Amino acid sequence: MASAKKAVLGPLVGAVDQGTSSTRFLVFNSKTAELLSHHQVEIKQEFPREGWVEQDPKEILQSVYECIEKTCEKLGQLNIDISNIKAIGVSNQRETTVVWDKLTGEPLYNAVVWLDLRTQSTVESLSKRIPGNNNFVKSKTGLPLSTYFSAVKLRWLLDNVRKVQKAVEEDRALFGTIDSWLIWSLTGGASGGVHCTDVTNASRTMLFNIHSLEWDKELCEFFEIPMKILPNVRSSSEIYGLMKISHSPKAGALEGVPISGCLGDQSAALVGQMCFQDGQAKNTYGTGCFLLCNTGRKCVFSEHGLLTTVAYKLGRDKPVYYALEGSVAIAGAVIRWLRDNLGIIKSSEEIEKLAKEVGTSYGCYFVPAFSGLYAPYWEPSARGIICGLTQFTNKCHIAFAALEAVCFQTREILDAMNRDCGIPLSHLQVDGGMTNNKILMQLQADILYIPVVKPSMPETTALGAAMAAGAAEGVGVWSLEPEDLSAVTMERFEPQINAEESEIRYSTWKKAVMKSMGWVTTQSSESGDPSIFCSLPLGFFIVSSVVMLIGARYLSGMP
């Protein structure tokens, strides 16, 4: 019975899905796209100062090893032979920046996460010296000059971390986004690891020319980035190197398996949703929220605050495809904030129960601009607000407002995309962990006033990475021909409110967004000692107390 089961499975493909909140390793049947097994580990985020977001690159790498080991263990329990795994793909959180020592394999600083805001004053000073015109960066990269992207994070590390400066001087430093760090480590690390990235991840650094598909010398000179530390840029589907993890007893059977697919997480989801045609779009609900529309082989530049990015290049000799993207910084992260910071919920799943209890925000609106506002505003001065509170408001209303906020932000970027493309989307394909929340999906259909369509298997990001890996030349176990792609079962959510109510709620949300702007100004120092500022409140308290004591004595006539 067991041998018969093995015989029908055919070639398997694994996928590392390394996101902002968690790491997963998933294994798919390449003939049916069926998910056979997976394991997930939550990843810590560190907030050393206001606006700073970091992660430990070694913890990220260890989480990958753990997920591979546990998944292989589960496959063994299912009597599935892991030697059937013929390739591995990688999808990853984009923009997050790592610099490490190529001789020791040690990170030289924590990973600076895409959400991090410490580089705002760097962005402002750079914007004042853009050569020629304000489109210098955007015309080459498709991106606005923003704290979001890797170049300014790398610039900060070079300016402020002595270990990084010294390693660059001594030709020991390597830079990469999370995909580069993982592929280098998984293919041998300091003992011959492959230092590479793919076109989708490179296109998020602000150093990559999306027309020539090469690192841009002028951009590197503008940001003062030494090109010798940059990874080699490859397509999204080719053999980069072979797995070398013999130190891991349970995952050692994957030794020698090719890593042959690599896509930034949002591009991976586009592939996993099979959005291969011009005009097809998907929205992924993760830590942030990302709406991508395939624009085919042409670069479409937005006039409404969207990004132009590389969608995928599925083979060395295959054409590059582009996408328009609307990025929302905070989606699932707001649920984590309600859990970890406010203690309103004990688990992420609990928010659906709270929202269901009331079925309305009761006029409460939540703008979770914790890291400023991304598309379509690109407003770093914004901060989170909750408004419309009354004595009747309770945690259930706030939970509902948090879910609505995700949907309103999606509406904003969908409106921008419809204006850029000229043809409104008739429905929205969705994926990501938050799509398991049925109230969120129904709210999204109501607020967009179009149907929302969700695949029954929500792991489309990992699926996209697996498809790219399995289709690579030299692997060839996964066909991407339209006639060979597996049919996907979908769940459909139709709008249940009238258009007028949808518009009223949306217009009130827009008022709340306006109130969130202009809350902060750039701090004078990005690297100053925070302990200096910590002492100021105490100083003010002492001085004001002495003044009040003297005043009281004077008024009472005391000597």
UniProtKB/Swiss-Prot annotation:
Give the metabolic or biological pathway: Polyol metabolism; glycerol degradation via glycerol kinase pathway; sn-glycerol 3-phosphate from glycerol: step 1/1
Keywords, in A-Z order: ATP-binding, Cytoplasm, Glycerol metabolism, Kinase, Membrane, Metal-binding, Mitochondrion, Mitochondrion outer membrane, Nucleotide-binding, Nucleus, Transferase, Transmembrane, Transmembrane helix, Zinc
A GO cellular component annotated for this chain's UniProt record is: nucleus
Q: Where are the transmembrane segments?
A: 532-552
Q: How does it sit in the membrane?
A: Single-pass membrane protein
SUPFAM superfamilies cross-referenced by the UniProt entry: Actin-like ATPase domain (SSF53067)
Which Enzyme Commission numbers does its entry carry?
Answer: 2.7.1.30
Q: Which PANTHER family match?
A: GLYCEROL KINASE (PTHR10196:SF56), SUGAR KINASE (PTHR10196)
Tell me the protein's name: Glycerol kinase
Species for this entry: Bos taurus (Bovine)
Protein encoded by which gene: GK
